[in-house]
């Protein structure tokens, strides 16, 4: 009789990850509106600043509201190494893993299209979506994670961030108005690619914040989450929970500093998903995960 594979301890779910996901879901479900209303009950400089952080900047800049989407993508990345280890322990083949990745990515893209009004048949509809970006970015990151070792994965993330910076800095939109900044909505190559290749209607007519080219650095966000999850999984026996939380907190500080310094030449911008934005939200996500992890540590399913 063929022995039944057992589930490794490393595939146990992290209560801290579930708690962080729940925290993020609060804001996805509209908790920011409640925060703003409470702030209005107590006028003042601090409450005004908190209320302002519950909305997106018009273009360049950063607020707490900008962290909700990338944190969710980062969390999806963290959980993948645990899911992958479990699938492999149950005998999944490489083909099985590919099919599961593609199915999940395709379903998220489909759900995004449905949310945008697929069944209303009101063409041209918007085809890009938050769910679609999560599906595409996560699936591409999972494919890369599946096929490369850790050092190569880190190199890929670095190449994406530096390459995206170079592309946006050096290649303006061919149809940009004279004098348009390469990081403006009118002048960026990101919007040009949307107008050229993105089916349907972009969100801003000339640009879509969940468009094609800006999904590439979102892949880096998902991969950074996967690298974090792999670090936690592989260091289970070697490091204490507090030590792992400390290392993640230090990495959070490093990423945040890199993002702030990079902002001097490559503005932090969620709609463009700039490389500086990737670094800052990676710092935020790592810091939040370290905080939740330190408080809750491991738990059995």
Language-model segment annotations:
Residues 298-301:
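Conserved small/polar residues in nucleotide/adenosyl-binding loops
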Residues 3-87:
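N-terminal signal-anchor module of multipass membrane proteins
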Residues 119-127, 265-272:
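Membrane-interface helix caps and helix-loop-helix hairpins in membrane proteins
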């Amino acid at each position: 009789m063929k022995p039944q594979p057992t589930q490794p301890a490393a595939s146990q779910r992290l209560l801290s990850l579930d708690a962080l996901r729940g925290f993020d879901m609060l804001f996805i479900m509209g908790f920011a509106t409640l925060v703003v209303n409470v702030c209005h009950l107590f006028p003042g400089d601090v409450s005004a600043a908190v209320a302002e952080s519950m909305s997106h900047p018009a273009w360049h800049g950063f607020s707490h509201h900008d962290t909700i989407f990338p944190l969710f993508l980062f969390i999806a990345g963290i959980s993948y190494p645990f899911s992958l280890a479990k699938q492999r322990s149950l005998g999944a083949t490489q083909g099985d893993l590919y099919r599961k990745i593609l199915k999940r990515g395709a379903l998220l893209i489909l759900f995004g299209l449905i949310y945008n009004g697929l069944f209303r048949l009101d063409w041209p509809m918007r085809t890009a979506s938050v769910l679609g970006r999560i599906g595409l970015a996560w699936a591409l990151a999972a494919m890369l994670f599946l096929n490369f070792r850790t050092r190569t994965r880190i190199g890929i993330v670095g190449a994406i961030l530096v390459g995206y910076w170079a592309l946006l800095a050096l290649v303006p939109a061919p149809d940009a108005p004279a004098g348009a900044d390469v990081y403006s909505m009118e002048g960026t190559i990101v919007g040009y690619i949307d107008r050229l290749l993105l089916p349907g209607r972009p969100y801003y007519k000339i640009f879509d914040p969940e468009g094609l080219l800006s999904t590439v650095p979102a892949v880096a966000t998902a991969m950074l989450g996967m690298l974090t999850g792999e670090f936690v999984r592989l260091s289970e026996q070697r490091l204490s929970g507090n030590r792992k939380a400390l290392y993640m907190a230090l990495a959070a500080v490093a990423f945040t500093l890199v993002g702030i310094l990079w902002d001097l030449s490559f503005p932090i911008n969620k709609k463009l998903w700039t490389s500086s934005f990737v670094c800052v939200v990676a710092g935020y996500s790592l810091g939040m995960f370290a905080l939740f992890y330190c408080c809750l540590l491991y738990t059995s399913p």
